[in-house]
Swiss-Prot record:
Associates with the primase and the primase-associated factor to form the helicase-primase complex. This is DNA replication helicase. It comes from Human cytomegalovirus (strain AD169). GO terms for cellular component: host cell nucleus. The keyword Nucleotide-binding applies. Belongs to the herpesviridae helicase family. Component of the helicase/primase complex. Unwinds the DNA at the replication forks and generates single-stranded DNA for both leading and lagging strand synthesis. The primase synthesizes short RNA primers on the lagging strand that the polymerase elongates using dNTPs. Possesses helicase-like motifs and therefore may act as the helicase subunit of the complex. GO terms for molecular function: ATP binding; helicase activity; hydrolase activity. Disulfide bonds: none annotated.
Length: 956
């Protein structure tokens, strides 16, 4: 059969999608992974491997003045802890005396484990194996990055209460451990406890001890915290109750099968850290897994050639942070002979071959060569030439603005944003807006930090200078270094939080009422600002407020750095897209089942607000209005009864009928109801006004909506005459909510079909903007404002795995978002906190909650809560570094490798090119394969050997 089709014969449309065929072809072998994991997870450790409560004697306290480890042993009070009282006393004594908890490596048992290696090209189906494991086995699913974890949550369709976490969160890592892990002094101190030099790690026992020592400061802190909690529980209850409480400490107690995605970004020693904490938590809780002597089975998923793990060290004295490449888990399992033999990698390696993200054969063949380090052919290099475009075009923000720019460094990203902002200021200034970023510094903690970091210093460094130098550590580096930040930092003193609260309380008592500034249940919860953890600021401490401003672009492509709480309040898109969502129940289907009632209520509110569009569209004629009036409107008891009461209500002399012009019951939940007579002053603005929701009666001579309806029934929408605004979910049963939704949906679809028929299909292409039970005003400075002063919607979250469009910001109260005031200084709250508004791929609008983060610094073994930042948790998808794009699928990509790139690596080239889903939408400033680049040749022989090994499981 000839493979050349006739030019006159049209190519038949394939019955099945290429990606589906590729996934089906690999399904059988993917199922074998389940059998392999089952076999590995059946391993048991021997009863004599662990002594009773071994975890209580793995460390001791050494005073900082002691230089001799053996001498310190006799001075320590916690070699073996026999009671909760002695443990607490020792911990307190060590803290006061500047003691450091050091390991007793001679008392450490060996922690056995099993490992399965799952690698492959980008988009080859590694995630499919995780889906199969999650569906068939009881396992703990994690990722090394937030993006990887949230991507798995979306793929596995996890509910909001069961989101996939990062492996660091699973074993107990929190923000205050960042400086502990980075401390150069701690790592230098622990060098003396190593059992051997790296080249002498000839046994798995030696390797495990040295790897755990590399992370010991964090391990010791987590262990101390858990032991103190266990001892407090044991003192107040039985040992069994204490064990049961500890069993809920970590997901590592749920299963001995632990899946870690994107392991190529995790340093080698983290594998042993995960193994250690599996045994620690299960031994502490005396769980079923520990009683059955289950050995942990770690499934390491990722690509060793497209990622690299970095390790950093921070010096408090010089305030310098050094970053260098480390050995990642995947490379260690592939190259380290000790791990290869112990884990039997030859028999426990699954390799995915073909790229399913992009099904172009030539492009997939190129990626395969790059992934496995096979020498490239000349035709591969020539093939990449087709993607080259002039550098000036790629660096011009106005050229191919829909494409995501990828750069090697943050400096290049920042330069691109500056060019973009300058260009927008000239042509589309209305798209730019800036918002404040707050940093509340505790003066006492900062002073103590300066004294610990530089005891001989004459005076502490100015706090604003310290903030500028440590901005990358205080606030997420990738999030902020790419944005256009103001060069000026405003510094001002804050009143003590207790004084602000007292003033507010006296004001409330004088004027009456409570109220919440940023939404939720109201009341005065500022006092909770003092109630946090062991590093919380004292109520009487003085604080300094540092403020800088960050510039955003309306309509730009953005993402978030972590799962962020948000509220769905509206929809913005085309009428056709909205109808498609209704017909397929797309929004309902993607909502977790426990939130189903809220989803039905939200879409009902959107439908109610969207009904006005049929009467105000540019295509609406009198003939269409007559046809629309004939559409059947079924009775909905919960809405029609209220409508009847409205019609029967007497006229009010004040011109404001409390039924027609009521304040929404939802809007009073914040404690500050908006009077109907209160006017809103707007400059240049666009108003989406739904007549039945309008509260405006500014001109006494103007004809009101009600009067207009009295004069002509043709322009009176019978929908709004029959139904009142849907009440809140608390007033309806689930059945009533679903009935209301189906009724509104059917009416909307019938009206849509009628308009499509009468307009010849043109109505579907019109833009549609609808908000949940609200009238909305778009101001010239990108501010979105509700005419009631508040928004109401469904509580949800936005994911780092998704891309969103920035629509602006709002300063209005968001009633569905719980208050975060207890974490923010009350004086900052009084200034008002703006929230960003994002639109997802379907068109739904989210109000993003503010991001509040506490920066805890560790110096000389002491943790200090130095500052709290309030920002927006946003990262740009318009432009980013190649490293930041790891794990993302992008539709259109423009890569700028620079004019004379230094330290260019094959991993950079591979990650940048493999992000795109279609090579037709890829462009680069140069052909990087024609430039000198660092090849990952060290690991290539091992991969080639595995490809030829019959024991390796290959999945095409």
């Amino acid at each position: 059969m000839s493979m050349t089709a006739s030019s006159s014969t049209p190519r038949p449309t394939p019955k099945y999608d290429d990606a589906l065929i590729l996934n089906l072809s690999s399904a059988a072998k993917i199922e074998r992974i389940v059998d392999k994991v089952k076999s590995l997870s059946r391993e048991r450790f021997a009863p004599e491997d662990f002594s009773f409560q071994w975890f209580r004697s793995i460390s001791r306290v050494e005073r900082t003045t002691d230089n001799n480890p053996s001498a310190a042993t006799t001075a320590a009070a916690t070699t073996t802890v026999h009671s909760s009282a002695s443990s607490s006393a020792a911990a307190a004594a060590s803290s006061e005396a500047g003691g450091t908890r050091v390991p007793c490596v001679d008392r450490w048992p060996f922690f056995p484990f099993r490992a399965l290696l799952v690698t492959g090209t980008a988009g080859a189906g590694k995630t499919s194996s995780i889906q199969v494991l999650a569906a068939n086995l009881d396992c703990v699913i994690t990722g090394t990055t937030v993006i990887a974890a949230q991507n798995l949550s979306a793929i596995l369709n996890r509910t909001r209460s069961a989101q996939v976490k990062t492996i660091y969160r699973v074993f107990g890592f929190v923000s205050k451990h960042v400086p502990l892990a980075d401390s150069a002094v701690s790592h230098e101190t622990l060098e003396r406890y190593r059992v051997c030099e790296p080249h002498e790690e000839t046994t798995i026992q030696r390797l495990q001890i040295n790897d755990l020592l590399a992370y010991w400061p964090v391990i010791a802190d987590i262990v101390d915290k858990c032991l103190n909690m266990w001892e407090r529980k044991a003192a107040s209850a039985s040992a069994a109750a204490a064990a049961a409480a500890c069993e809920d400490l970590s997901e590592l107690c749920e299963s001995n099968i632990i899946v870690i995605d994107e392991c190529g970004l995790m340093l080698r020693y983290m594998l042993q850290v995960v193994v250690f904490f599996y045994y620690f938590y299960n031994a502490l809780g005396d769980t079923r897994l520990y009683r059955e002597r289950r050995v942990p089975c770690i499934i390491c998923v990722g690509s060793p050639t497209q990622t690299e793990a970095l390790e950093s060290r921070y010096d408090h004295y010089t305030q310098n942070k050094s970053v260098r490449k480390g050995v990642d888990v995947l490379s260690a399992l592939i190259q380290n002979e000790v791990l290869i033999n112990y884990c039997d990698i030859a028999d426990n390696w699954v390799m995915f071959i073909h790229n399913k993200r992009c099904t172009d054969l030539d492009f997939g063949d190129l990626l395969k060569y790059m992934e496995f380090g096979i020498p490239l052919k000349e035709e591969h290099v020539a093939y990449v030439d087709r993607f080259v475009r002039p550098p000036s075009s790629i660096r011009n923000p106005s050229y191919a603005a829909e494409m995501t720019r990828l750069f090697l460094s943050h400096v290049e990203v920042q330069a691109y944003f500056k060019r973009l902002h300058e260009q927008i200021r000239l042509s589309e200034r209305h798209r730019l807006f800036d918002l404040p970023v707050y940093c509340v510094v505790n003066n006492r903690a900062y002073q103590e930090l300066c004294e610990l970091a530089d005891p001989l210093g004459d005076s502490p460094q100015p706090v604003e200078l310290w903030f500028r130098q440590n901005l990358a550590r205080i606030i997420n580096y990738s999030q902020f270094v790419d944005h256009n930040l103001s060069s000026e930092i405003t510094k001002e003193a804050l009143r003590p939080a207790a004084d602000v609260v007292a003033t507010n309380n006296s004001s409330v008592q004088a004027h009456g009422g409570g109220g919440s500034v940023i939404g939720s249940t109201g009341g005065n919860d500022e006092t909770a600002f003092f109630q946090d953890d062991d590093t919380t600021t004292a109520p009487d401490s003085r604080e300094t407020l540092l403020t800088l401003r960050i510039t955003y672009i309306k309509g730009s492509s953005v993402g978030v750095n972590s799962k962020v709480r948000a509220c769905v309040i509206g929809y913005q898109g085309t009428v056709e897209r909205f109808v498609d969502i209704l017909q397929k129940d797309t929004f309902i289907e993607r909502t977790p089942c426990e939130q189903a009632a809220y989803a039905y209520s939200l879409v009902s509110g959107l439908l109610f607000s969207a009904m006005y569009y049929f009467y105000v569209s540019p295509y609406t004629t009198e003939e269409m209005l007559r046809e629309l009036a004939r559409v059947e409107l079924p009775d909905v008891s919960s809405l029609c009864a209220a409508a009847a009461a409205t019609a029967a209500a007497p006229a009010w002399s004040g011109g404001e009928n409390p039924i027609n012009n009521h304040v929404d019951a939802d809007s009073s939940q914040g404690g500050q109801s908006v009077p109907v007579s209160q006017r809103m002053e707007h400059g240049q603005e666009e108003t989406h006004d739904i007549p039945c929701l309008s509260n405006h009666h500014d001109d006494s001579d103007a004809i009101t909506d009600a009067e207009l309806m009295d004069h002509t029934s043709l322009y009176a929408d019978p929908f709004f005459l029959k139904y009142v605004k849907p009440p809140s979910l608390a007033l309806l049963s689930f059945e009533e909510t679903v009935h209301m939704y189906t009724t509104f949906r059917d009416i909307f679809l019938k009206r849509y079909q009628l308009m499509q028929r009468l307009t010849g299909g043109r109505f579907a292409t019109l833009p549609l903007v609808t908000y949940n039970r609200r009238n909305v005003v778009f101001k010239a400075n990108c501010q979105i404002s509700s005419q009631t002063g508040s928004f109401v919607g469904m509580l949800s979250h936005v994911s780092p795995a998704q891309t969103y469009t920035l629509e602006g910001y709002t300063s209005d109260n968001v009633l569905s978002l719980p208050s975060d005031r207890h974490r923010i200084h009350p004086e900052v709250v009084q200034r008002g906190l703006s929230r960003l508004v994002l639109r997802d791929a379907l068109g739904f609008l989210f109000v993003l909650d503010v991001n509040v983060s506490r920066f805890v610094e560790s110096a000389q073994g002491k943790s200090l809560h130095v500052c709290t930042t309030v920002d927006y948790g946003l990262t740009s998808r318009t432009a980013m570094t190649i490293a930041k794009s790891q794990g993302l699928s992008l539709e259109k990509v423009a890569v700028d490798f620079g004019d004379h790139p230094k330290n260019l690596k094959m991993s950079h080239i591979y990650v940048a090119m493999s992000r795109v889903t279609d090579p037709e939408h890829l462009m680069m400033n140069v052909n990087p394969l024609r430039l000198p680049y660092e090849k990952n040749t060290a690991i290539t022989p091992y991969i080639c050997r595995a490809l030829k090994d019959k024991r390796t499981t290959l999945i095409f």
